[in-house]
Amino acid sequence: MAQETNQTPGPMLCSTGCGFYGNPRTNGMCSVCYKEHLQRQQNSGRMSPMGTASGSNSPTSDSASVQRADTSLNNCEGAAGSTSEKSRNVPVAALPVTQQMTEMSISREDKITTPKTEVSEPVVTQPSPSVSQPSTSQSEEKAPELPKPKKNRCFMCRKKVGLTGFDCRCGNLFCGLHRYSDKHNCPYDYKAEAAAKIRKENPVVVAEKIQRI
């Protein structure tokens, strides 16, 4: 019995076609189909050769057969779980391949859509013919003339006064003798200026008219 339980048969599908793995000890059927088969035989009163042999054996043989059925059921469930995990892992393994294909297609589209950059050719500029420069004499003529320093002289006697000269309102410079208006016949009208200044400082005040009621 110990040798039989230690031997693990190769995986094989159930003979009834349910999709689970069968066991040669249960006539090539899975544990569920085998239990249904035994129930049918008990109901119909027909016992298979394996069923009669199991019935003639002691209660210990019945418990051993039940344990075998349970182990076969566990093996079938483990095999089914492994197949489901493999089927789930297949799209996960194939996922990087699809990503690579999509990336390759995107890169090809980018290469097609991106325009070719035009290579800018170096522009060669030819030196323009040298223009004849004007002579130094013309440049000197065009240069602005520096203002001559004004000599401080009296407008009447042409005496050098320097910084001691007097500016008159007529716009001329005079010495100490000719600084007065009666000495150099000043054309400036002092009377008109004084009258305008007086009118500005002393405006005419007119009382408001009385309105009759």
From Swiss-Prot:
An annotated GO BP: smooth muscle tissue development
Gene3D superfamilies from the UniProt entry: 1.20.5.4770, AN1-like Zinc finger (4.10.1110.10)
ZnF (AN1-type) ranges: 148-194
Residues reported to bind Zn(2+) 2: 154, 157, 175, 178
Start-end of A20-type zinc fingers: 8-42
InterPro entries the record matches: AN1-like_Znf, AN1_A20_ZnFinger, Znf_A20, Znf_AN1
Residues that coordinate or bind Zn(2+) 3: 168, 170, 184, 186
Expression (tissue specificity): Highly expressed in skeletal muscle. Expressed in fetal cochlea. Also expressed in infant brain, fetal heart, pancreatic islet, melanocyte, pineal gland, placenta, corneal stroma, and parathyroid tumor. Weakly expressed or undetectable in adult brain, heart, colon, thymus, spleen, kidney, liver, small intestine, placenta, lung and peripheral blood leukocytes. Expressed in rhabdomyosarcoma RD cells (at protein level).
Region (Disordered), start-end ranges: 39-149
SUPFAM superfamilies linked to this entry: AN1-like Zinc finger (SSF118310), Glucocorticoid receptor-like (DNA-binding domain) (SSF57716)
Keywords: Acetylation, Cytoplasm, Metal-binding, Phosphoprotein, Ubl conjugation pathway, Zinc, Zinc-finger
Amino acids binding Zn(2+) 1: 14, 18, 30, 33
GO CC, alphabetical: cytoplasm
GO-annotated molecular function: DNA binding; zinc ion binding
PROSITE patterns, per the entry: ZF_A20, ZF_AN1
Keyword Thylakoid attributed: no
Residues recorded as bearing N6-acetyllysine in the entry: 209
Biased composition (Low complexity): 120-138
Skewed-composition ranges (Basic and acidic residues): 139-148
Modified residues (Phosphoserine): 48, 58
Polar residues biased stretches: 40-75
Function: Involved in protein degradation via the ubiquitin-proteasome system. May act by anchoring ubiquitinated proteins to the proteasome. Plays a role in ubiquitin-mediated protein degradation during muscle atrophy. Plays a role in the regulation of NF-kappa-B activation and apoptosis. Inhibits NF-kappa-B activation triggered by overexpression of RIPK1 and TRAF6 but not of RELA. Also inhibits tumor necrosis factor (TNF), IL-1 and TLR4-induced NF-kappa-B activation in a dose-dependent manner. Overexpression sensitizes cells to TNF-induced apoptosis.
Domain text: The A20-type zinc finger directly binds polyubiquitin chains and associates with the 26S proteasome. The zinc-finger A20-type domain is essential for inhibition of NF-kappa-B activation.
Subunit structure: Interacts with ubiquitin and polyubiquitinated proteins. Identified in a heterotrimeric complex with ubiquitin and SQSTM1, where ZFAND5 and SQSTM1 both interact with the same ubiquitin molecule. Homooligomer and/or heterooligomer. Interacts (via A20-type domain) with IKBKG and RIPK1 and with TRAF6 (via AN1-type domain).
Name of the protein described by the UniProt record: AN1-type zinc finger protein 5
Gene assigned in the entry: ZFAND5
